[in-house]
Amino acid sequence: MICNQCPRRCNAIREANIAEGFCGMPSEPVVARADLHLWEEPCISGSSGSGTIFFSGCVLKCVFCQNSVISTERFGKKISINRLAQIMKELEDKGAHNINFVTPTHYVHAIKDALKIYTPKIPLVYNCGGYEDLDLIKEDVFDIYLFDLKYLSSETSLKYSL
């Protein structure tokens, strides 16, 4: 695929074994962790946890990243679209209050394909760094958008995120 999913619009080739884009990730999802997560904002975690899927890679590369192993070092396991759909169902079956996609920007295509296979009955959370394509948000795929507010100026963002 020629990738233009994030605002960088890098036109990179992203295939199963090719990852030329800014995010450095292949087209197939790479997941660092998927499980119930009790440490999000209380309204997201609830009493049973948020069904969190941590994707590897990132479109920001902030110098202060708390998840740099996940965001820049490709830590995680490559999974199929079918497996992503299964993970959503498994998390829902475990009692998750929602399905929480963390750093999903560069894998929105995979999430949409997985949702065609299985659509959870619980809310879908788009948990991101805040550098997003407005057209994606207008598509109304996700129920909750959890954005990080990192910077108030372009100058600061250029200094601390690549």
Task: State the predicted function of each range.
Residues 7-10, 27, 92, 161:
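Generic secondary-structure transition motif, activating predominantly at the C-termini of alpha-helices
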Residues 156-162:
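Anionic-ligand binding region
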Residues 1-20, 25:
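Auxiliary Fe-S-binding modules of radical SAM enzymes
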Residues 19, 23-145, 153-155:
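Conserved Radical SAM active-site core
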